[in-house]
């Protein structure tokens, strides 16, 4: 999620952000909780702005933890009214042993957790050492992906790779990506949650983690019963920025060598990290807290169809509005839902997931010509 309080030192849009030292986790969490309750600091109410896509959000169709999920994946009701800090900071189970996307066969019938990189071959330019403390992840954290397949007997419509928010200080999987994955699963989508690298790593290093997950899905498209081109990336707040960083600079044929000369490419790097659609949930293309509104910069990414979801009471409402208008004005296919009176950080709540899923299905169909 984005943060009102600056938990990083921001530079101009498109330039690398410099992370603050460890110990900023509490500030990041507090800032996001503030964003979930604080209205925009503007002279006029955002909710009075006429928008064709404006609607009153509802929790009627919000999906709770499915009965077949293991206890470790219990996220509760999925409703923002039941939010808890404990849930927001809960960590997803890590892979068993040294199971990776290369040494383990994809399992389309069960929840599966795999490390994204082989041990000792994780591309990085940040030196995260054992004496650096105060971060959400330990110094020896390895990025991983959690595959949550559709129910048995369901014909998959495509795949969605999800990234939770957390201001690059933590990953709110149990409030963002996991509830949404459960909802999309019920609608026929194979889902993959990426536990990408956080501070002190950079946005660029995290983008390589997302690219790796996309490559894994494309490699195993037949196993998961999907067309390899029917893959979307979506993220919440900082997770959406992470999805955008992939699409702007680290998709297709870009590999770990782009950041780390010592990285040794493997067979997965031969597969393009191509995504056919993007979902930006209370997020935008840019950097933490700063959306990029420059159409020339955005055009460099050859961006796919993009779907925005945000609330009128989000502190970043105006930036979401502005970028949506820029993107749609560039001729990029767009979709949007604006939830009247809703804040930042609502996750899968609000009644937007079905519309997003229907839009994705349309995009995937249109891509086939």
Predicted segments, located by residue:
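Catalytic nucleophile-loop/oxyanion-hole region of alpha/beta-hydrolase
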Residues: 172-174, 179, 194-226, 346-351
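C-terminal catalytic histidine-bearing segment of alpha/beta-hydrolase fold enzymes
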Residues: 321-324, 328-369
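Short beta-strand element of the alpha/beta-hydrolase
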Residues: 156-165
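Primarily recognizes the serine-hydrolase "nucleophile elbow" in alpha/beta-hydrolase
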Residues: 212-301
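Acidic catalytic loop of the alpha/beta-hydrolase fold
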Residues: 286-287, 312-317
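N-terminal cap/lid segment of alpha/beta-hydrolase-fold proteins
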Residues: 69-154
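Short beta-strand/loop motif that positions the catalytic acidic residue
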Residues: 308-310
């Amino acid at each position: 999620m984005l943060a009102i309080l600056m938990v990083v030192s921001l530079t101009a849009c498109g330039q690398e952000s410099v992370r603050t030292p460890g110990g900023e986790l509490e500030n990041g969490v507090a800032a996001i909780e503030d964003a979930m309750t604080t209205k925009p600091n503007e002279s006029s109410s955002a909710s009075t702005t006429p928008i064709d896509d404006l609607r009153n959000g509802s929790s009627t169709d919000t999906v709770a933890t499915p009965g077949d999920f293991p206890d470790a994946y219990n996220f509760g009701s999925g409703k923002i009214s039941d939010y808890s800090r404990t849930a927001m900071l809960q960590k997803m189970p890590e892979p068993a042993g040294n199971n990776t996307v290369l040494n383990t066969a994809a399992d389309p019938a069960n929840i599966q957790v795999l490390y994204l990189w082989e041990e000792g071959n994780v591309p990085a330019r940040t030196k995260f050492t054992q004496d650096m403390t105060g971060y959400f992840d330990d110094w020896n954290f390895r990025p991983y992906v959690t595959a949550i397949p559709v129910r048995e007997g369901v014909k998959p419509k495509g795949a969605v790779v999800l990234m939770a928010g957390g201001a690059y200080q933590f990953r709110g999987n149990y409030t963002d990506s996991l509830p949404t994955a459960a909802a999309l699963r019920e609608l026929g989508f194979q889902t993959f949650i990426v536990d990408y690298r956080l501070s002190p790593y950079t946005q660029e290093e995290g983008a390589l983690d997302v690219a790796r997950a996309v490559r894994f899905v494309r490699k195993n498209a037949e196993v998961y019963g999907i067309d390899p081109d029917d893959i979307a990336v979506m993220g919440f707040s900082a997770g959406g920025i992470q999805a955008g960083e992939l699409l702007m600079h680290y998709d297709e044929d870009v590999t770990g060598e782009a950041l780390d000369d010592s990285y040794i490419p493997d067979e997965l790097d031969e597969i393009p990290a191509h995504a056919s659609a993007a979902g930006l949930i209370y997020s935008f293309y840019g950097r933490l807290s700063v959306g990029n509104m420059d159409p020339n910069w955005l055009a460099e990414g050859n961006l796919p169809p993009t779907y925005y979801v945000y609330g009128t009471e989000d502190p970043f409402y105006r930036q979401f509005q502005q970028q949506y208008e820029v993107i749609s004005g560039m001729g990029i296919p767009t979709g949007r839902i604006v939830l009247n009176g809703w804040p930042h950080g609502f996750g899968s709540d609000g009644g937007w997931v079905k519309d997003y899923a229907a839009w994705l299905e349309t995009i995937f169909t249109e891509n086939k010509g």
